[in-house]
Every structure is written in structure tokens, then in C-alpha cells.
Amino acid sequence: GITDDANITGLIALSAAFKKGWKWRDDLIRYLNKNLETLLNAIKNYKNASPLVPQATYLLWVSIKNPKHKNLQSHFEKYGVGINDGIEFGKKNNIRINFATNHQNIKKASKRIEEALINL
């Protein structure tokens, strides 16, 4: 349930993260930036797709100009890519890609995204 007391285990974990977690954080940011760069390289050659580079998240928004398909999520799923359709967030003709995964997944997804964009 909900309590107004701090959990001792949580406090210890928080203290450890602030004392010794900076290297892990920096490594994670570098890793995520590499994933982002891979995705941006896959998208940059398609005039119908405009990525919005995130400032503080691992979610890449991509605006799709004049898509032939109304349901972007099902279109990308046909190519084996799980995205969120922006319509769910009030952003019609946009997709959201979560790039917080391993590099191998991003490499595979990038190729599939390119195929999906070609046929969009």
C-alpha cells in the first residue's frame, strides 16, 4: 500500500546510485546515443520522414509526410518493427520509436524501418 515513510532499501539504493552510479549513467547515455545515431542514419535518406531528435529520452519521434497508409503502426508491423502510432498521443502522421535496447536490435530494426519507409 501507500505509506508516508521512505523504504530503507530504496534509500540505500538511491544513495549508492548518487555516490557510484555516474560512470554507469555516462556509459548508458553513450550507448543510447549510438542507437539513436544508427536510427537517424537509417531515416535521413527519406524525404517523407523527419526525425525530432530527443533531448532527454530514449524515444525518437518521426513525422511522416503524406503517408499512403492511415494506420502507421500496422504498416511498420508488417516489416517487423514495433512502433507507437503518434495518433495515440495526439500527433497524427507521427511515429514513436523506443531505442532503449541492444545494438543488434537497433541494426535489425533500422533496416526494417528503411524498408517500411520506402513502401510508405
What function would you assign to each model-found segment?
Residues 19, 63-65, 100-102:
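Residue-level recognition of strand-loop junctions within catalytic nucleotide-signaling folds
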Residues 43, 62, 97-99:
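Preference for bulky hydrophobic residues occupying beta-strand positions
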Residues 1-7, 87-88:
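Active-site PLP-lysine loop of aminotransferase-like
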Residues 12-16, 31, 38, 71, ...:
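Alpha-helical elements of Rossmann-like donor-binding domains used by nucleotide-donor carbohydrate transfer enzymes
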Residues 46:
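Acidic-histidine catalytic/liganding microenvironments
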Residues 39-42, 116:
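Short alpha-helical functional segments enriched in proximate histidine and acidic residues
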Residues 8-11, 15, 24, 31-40, ...:
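Conserved glycine-rich beta-strand-loop-beta hairpin in the small C-terminal domain of fold type I
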Residues 74-84, 89-120:
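PLP-dependent enzyme catalytic core of the Aspartate aminotransferase-like
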